[in-house]
UniProtKB/Swiss-Prot annotation:
Coiled coil: none annotated. Residues 76-617 form the PLA2c domain. Catalyzes the release of fatty acids from lysophospholipids. It holds the Pfam family PLA2_B. It comes from Schizosaccharomyces pombe (strain 972 / ATCC 24843) (Fission yeast). Residues 1-19 form the signal peptide. The keyword Phosphoprotein does not apply. This is Probable lysophospholipase 3. One of its GO terms (cellular component) is endoplasmic reticulum.
Length: 662
């Protein structure tokens, strides 16, 4: 059993009961206890009967007989050299998907733009493989980000028949990327045959119960649940692989996100390729990202390597490596691209483990917590001992056998940061403060023309985004593109957070980079190397307060419906037909510029209204004073002022303790 991992988690859950040191996003909001997070009062104090223990074990064993194994296994490698240089462009598999998807995108986008009434010859703008390419990017932010992003995605989806003015945008997109809570959204739709959000919410996500207590106050079912988790992780450990908190986290998440018995212990991310929607290229190509952390690091540097998981490949475009491993062989340790003894690993890319990797919040939580707790010396000592142990044991990360050991790239100016390590340690995709997965959509080989960046980040003390995620991406490009450690096409100019808040750029969708000749790439003729136009969709209380804590792990129907509705109305600007026209303008702008076609007068008006015009504001108090209120009354039942109740961490400890006694 994973006594180390469970013991650490148990201690983490108990500590908040002793004191309430705030996380960064909870400075003004102490832990609240909600009924949806609680099990029956006093449950953990009541001794379990022998009958209850036996019943839980019987349930657990019966379920295990019907599912596959979580354990990775050895296979013979398909070739002696397993890495693909990224200088070749995107993989042949991704290219094949894109080639199949282009005609479908062109048809859908022509239909969407025609339906908006935009006065443009859509057949001239969208007629070949050089037509507009749209990428969707969904931020991190736990369950808040998943449900908010789901509301936006629902508004973009033409399958719903809900009269959304933006219906068809999903079907018009080439890529869809997610990190952390956004990876739960992207991963869940991709793994579940791209089911729509209504189906997932009603049948899969089980939002009313916490991932830590999925069966509410049913003691026996919850004990069986933890016994199943323990058994699955032991399968991987017994097969000879390192395990970490992320295995536990990923298996628990899978039961919320994957529509299969026990969350599909043997369902892999690469198996998405076998699903009907993917084989037909009916929906955008999914990408999940995660940050790397070197063994000696406790904090994530701004220039950390960003890794991506796709149905075909795992790797990074950063110039220190710039090479990819086939996704189905993730978990294979390579030396200079060659597998020892011709042995490769399969089944390591478990879908839940991948989503858990992108959302490994534990080390950020611990780091900030350990820095905040100073008033109680005993508590301070306990927390720091736990923190030091995690750092030493690397249990706060997701360990991946290193495919880049002793690997040397063709780029002689940047060193491979992982060349001496046996494992690559991956952490939450937002820990570098780039909390929207824009990065994978900026690579020249993907030719993305416009990015819709959906931001549900908890930036300020009140829980609303202030634009810092796109500011950080902009700063990374300015800093590291210059020294050639990264290779992207550039980015639109982005103002600082003071300006974003002072000008209200985070209160509605805002366009950046409307003029393709005025970006970080310089004043050049617009072509396929021009940086994309960015449409920023911030979370904002249009009809509902959706600024719940990242550590909220359950929602009742009123709350989830309120967040979904608020997200849709905020994204569509109250289902505005005129805003749909403006989004159509953003979608085709780079194509118009490339083809040297004139901008329609409707688009000129749109750009005056929604594009940042370059104005900056020096207002240091803007961020701290930002506290928006709802614009109008919600049509959702209940009140819009309902706040979510974050998970009661210490109850998880009691469950773990009891389950370990089985």
């Amino acid at each position: 059993m994973l006594f180390n991992c469970f013991g650490i988690l148990a201690l983490l859950q108990i500590l908040p009961a002793l004191a309430y040191p705030p996380c960064r996003e909870q400075m003004s909001d102490p832990y609240e206890f909600g009924e949806s997070d609680l099990m029956r009062p006093g449950m953990h104090d009541t001794p379990l009967s022998l009958m209850q223990k036996r019943e839980a074990l019987a349930i657990s064993l019966s379920k295990r007989d019907s599912v596959g194994s979580y354990a990775p296994y050895n296979v013979t490698c398909p070739s002696d050299y397993m890495l693909r240089p990224a200088s070749d462009g995107i993989s042949s598999g991704e290219q094949s998907f894109i080639d199949k998807r282009i005609p479908k995108i062109n048809t859908q986008m022509r239909s969407f733009i025609s339906n908006t009434g935009l006065d443009v010859d859509v057949n001239s703008v969208i007629n070949d493989s050089d037509g507009p390419r749209l990428g969707l990017a969904f931020s991190g932010g736990g369950l808040r980000a998943m449900v908010h992003g789901g509301g936006v995605l629902n508004a973009f989806d033409s399958r719903n028949g809900n009269g959304s003015s933006l219906a068809g945008i999903l079907q018009s997109a080439m890529y869809i990327a997610g990190l952390s809570g956004g990876s739960w959204l992207v991963g869940s739709v991709a793994v579940n045959n791209f089911a729509n959000i209504t189906y997932l919410r009603d049948n899969v996500w089980n939002l009313e119960h916490s991932v830590f207590a999925p069966h509410g106050d049913n003691v026996v079912e919850n004990l069986a649940y933890y016994d199943d988790l323990d058994d699955e992780i032991d399968q991987k450990k017994d097969a000879g692989f390192d395990t970490s908190l992320t295995d536990l986290w990923g298996r628990a998440l899978s039961r919320k996100l994957v529509d299969a018995t026990q969350g599909g212990p043997n369902i892999t991310f690469s198996s998405i390729r076998n699903q009907t929607w993917f084989q037909n290229a009916d929906y955008p190509y999914p990408i999940i990202i995660s940050d790397s952390r070197l063994e000696e690091e406790k904090a994530i540097p701004a220039n950390t390597s960003i890794f991506e998981f796709t149905p075909y490949e795992f790797g990074t475009w950063d110039n220190g490596i710039k090479a990819f491993l086939p996704m189905e062989y993730v978990g294979t340790h390579l030396k200079n691209g060659v597998p020892p003894d011709h042995k490769c690993i399969r089944n390591y890319d478990n879908a839940g483990f991948v989503m858990g990797t992108s959302a490994t919040l534990f080390n950020t939580f611990l780091l900030e917590w350990s820095q905040e707790v100073t008033s109680n010396s005993t508590l301070y000592d306990i927390i720091h001992k736990v923190f030091e142990k995690l750092s030493e044991d690397q249990n706060d990360i997701a360990p991946y056998p290193n495919p880049y050991q002793n690997f040397t790239t063709t780029n002689t100016t940047v060193k491979n940061p992982f060349e001496r390590f046996d494992t690559i340690d991956l952490v939450d995709g937002g820990e570098d403060d780039e909390n929207i997965p824009i990065w994978p959509l900026l690579h020249p080989q993907r030719f993305v023309d416009v990015i819709f960046a959906v931001d549900a980040t908890y930036d300020d003390s009140n829980g609303w985004p202030d634009g810092s995620s796109i500011v950080t991406t902009y700063e990374r490009i300015i800093t590291y593109n210059a020294n050639k450690s990264v290779d992207v096409r550039g980015f639109p100019y982005i103002p600082d957070e003071d300006t974003i808040i002072s000008l209200g750029l985070n209160t509605h969708p805002t366009f950046f980079g409307c003029d393709g000749r005025n970006t970080t790439a310089g004043n050049h003729t617009v072509d396929n190397n021009t940086p994309p136009l960015l449409v920023y969709f911030p979370n904002y209380p249009w009809v509902y307060y959706s600024n719940i804590s990242t550590f909220t792990m359950s929602m009742n129907d009123t709350l989830s419906s309120g967040i979904l509705e608020n997200a849709a109305l905020s994204a569509t600007q109250n289902n505005s037909d005129s805003f749909a026209v403006c989004l159509a303008c953003a979608m085709i702008q780079r194509s118009l510029e490339r083809k040297n076609m004139s901008t329609p007068s409707q688009c000129s008006s749109c750009f005056e209204q929604y594009c940042w015009n370059g104005t900056t504001v020096n207002n240091p108090s803007a961020v701290s004073n930002y506290a928006p209120t709802v614009l109008s009354a919600s049509t959702t039942s209940g009140t819009s002022s309902v706040r979510a109740k974050p998970i009661v961490f210490y109850l998880f400890a009691s469950l773990l303790t009891v389950s370990l006694l089985l």
